[in-house]
A protein has these predicted regions:
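Well-structured core secondary-structure elements of compact alpha/beta domains
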Residues: 34-40
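Second-shell loop/turn segments in exported
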Residues: 40-48
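A cross-family detector of function-defining hotspots
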Residues: 1-27, 55-172
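Ligand-binding clamshell of periplasmic/extracellular solute-binding protein-like
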Residues: 31
């Protein structure tokens, strides 16, 4: 039997009112790796807050002019996952794409529904990777940042989550 290698991550979690901050130990120092809010008093990037309209996200973040024509699918291409706001692939495709460049994309995640209109809630997600990469090409084990906005059926932001995923140590 092979022993599974697990990495112990030391975290400090602070919650105040409707805001949660997570600090993770990276190279001996605690670094902010997540912030999440369900409250209207917490401001995130581009001035966005819970309670704002989804239109404010569209106004604040880049999207391709024809984004509603860019469906994104599951890896096996059998299920519609949502729409690509910009970018041509998600992190699920990094293994096949093998890029040395920045990876930036935004998606509308239908959370299992077939469209925004049929979904009770959906998520707008923005993800960013930047070189240098451990192996020279972008991989899910490299560090990256992501911000996600939960949207209700009225087009209102109900939660905001920001994450920084630190580079995973190479298993050599």
């Amino acid at each position: 039997s092979t022993a599974a290698q697990t990495e112990v991550v030391k975290e400090k979690i602070y919650s105040y009112n409707e805001l949660t901050l997570i600090f993770s130990e990276i190279k001996g120092k605690y670094v902010l790796t997540a912030a999440a809010s369900v409250g209207e008093n917490d401001t995130f990037s581009r001035g966005l807050k819970v309670g704002d309209s989804v239109d404010k996200i569209y106004d604040g973040y880049y999207r391709d002019a024809d984004y509603m024509n860019h469906t994104y699918y599951s890896d096996d291409k059998t299920a519609v996952m949502g729409k690509m706001l910009y970018g041509s692939f998600t992190m699920d495709a990094l293994e096949n794409v093998k890029t040395k460049d920045k990876v930036e994309y935004g998606v509308i995640n239908y959370k299992g529904a077939s469209s925004v209109e049929t979904s009770e809630t959906y998520i707008l997600e923005f993800t960013y990777f930047e070189p240098p990469y451990q192996s020279g090409i972008a991989a899910v084990t490299d560090d990256f940042a992501q911000i996600a906005f939960d949207i209700d059926d009225k087009g209102i932001i109900t939660a905001i989550r920001w994450y920084y995923y630190p580079e995973e140590e190479s298993a050599e």
